[in-house]
């Protein structure tokens, strides 16, 4: 995580916590008021609670031109963006997608096209209807990794996030109470 983004979010969160004018606006403020000092994990949690509705920004008397220049939604959005890149699996793909998204999409489309071409050119389908073009086994070979890898990536990202925010192990009693 970028230290300067966290420091700015921490500065603004501490001012907001002292003011508490916006305490009923969204789920960020009850979580904000639960702490007096904010760790990096706390700020990451607050950033991911914020939906960037900007209600607190428009109500705040400490936005520019005030010397505090508060813009909590922007500070939290920057931390949230950085956390998404940090927790993505694989990390290199999370960072690259922000800068080279079109290239990644084109590479993915080209990769799927090559898989379909290879399945059609290398294996005789031998079936009826659509299976005469592409066999069931070829479809499973193509789409099973395309289904499982995102689930695996989400699980890794969620685990990284949960460790960063200091989440406790989830138990069945937590799920019942939710």
For the regions a language model picked out, list residue spans one by one:
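N-terminal cofactor/phosphate-binding cores enriched in small/glycine residues
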Residues: 15-35
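Short helix-capping and inter-helix turn/linker motifs at the boundaries of alpha-helical repeat units
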Residues: 2-7, 37-38
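Extended, hydrophobic alpha-helical segments in both membrane/secreted and soluble proteins
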Residues: 1, 12, 21-26, 56, ...
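Iron-sulfur-cluster electron-transfer modules
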Residues: 13, 34, 38-178
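Local sequence-structure signature of Cys/Sec-based thiol-disulfide redox active-site neighborhoods
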Residues: 6-15
